[in-house]
């Protein structure tokens, strides 16, 4: 496995979103860490369909809870970066590192405040149409958010992906 930022999904709920994220991770070589409980089974038909036949190339890690993920992150090193619509720092103003852990929240309500507090940095994807700016959009789709942030990190790290 190459030394790339890791994608972490906290208690994902929608199978096709996780399948799309898995496909993005397979395409980039980034590890995918899922924190339980999941809102679906890993055998879910929609999850498999969204990931197509790329599952053999997904470096998948399943954690029974956030504490298990945190222990692995601390053992392996690297920063925990939380992505949230409630954060103030735009993701593109972050200087990403190859050992970063990119933490994304649940589709329904994002990351709990206590997890946001544990992150070294809290980042957001600026949106002109967001609720914060007078629009009606609360957030982007989870799989879109992962792709936007991960590809910016890879661009900065000049991975050639």
Predicted regions and their residues:
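Post-transcriptional modification and biogenesis factors for structured RNAs
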Residues: 1-161
